[in-house]
Amino acid sequence: MARVLVAFGSSEGQTATIAERIGDTLEDAGHDVVVVHAKHPPAELDPGRYDGVIVGASIHMGSHQSYVDSFVDKHNKALNRVPSAFFSVSLTAAHPDPDDREPAQEIVERFLEETGWEPDATLLVAGALKYSEYGLLKRVVMRRVAGKAGGDTDTARDYEYTDWDELEAFVDAFTALLPDAPEQP
């Protein structure tokens, strides 16, 4: 089967959880998978040595992590030579109305344009509100942001909005792009 690199940037942990789930799904399908945090990738990492690459990042304050930008900038030639995909995690992606998700899509499009990367697939992924992990100030700010957006504001619990079935379908579609991938029925 194929060798696949999953690189990610995560500020609060949900993107890391998603990247690990992607890695597990690919491994369960028989692929050789390496999952790395894009902030501190191994010095010898060469995405061009993989049969496919998935990169993920989360949106905060209107952009993805700058180190993910740097990772993609550095490796965009290799990323454009192999099957590749990008997933972007945000609370905006949790909105059921496509018009409400548009700001997140625009951030993805700007990111891809600025980095010169042309992935075969992209996906907006709903993130999580982890009130229990926030300090007081961040908890208050996130509660206010969530409230304005019609989201969950009970800070006594956490909320996960990630659609795992949608993510699995995204990974399955990516897998079909890999060399020696079985044909989809």
Please state what every model-predicted region is.
Residues 57-185:
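FMN-binding flavodoxin-like domain, especially the glycine-rich phosphate-binding loop
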Residues 1-82, 172-185:
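N-terminal beta1-alpha1-beta2 submodule of the flavodoxin-like/Rossmannoid cofactor-binding fold
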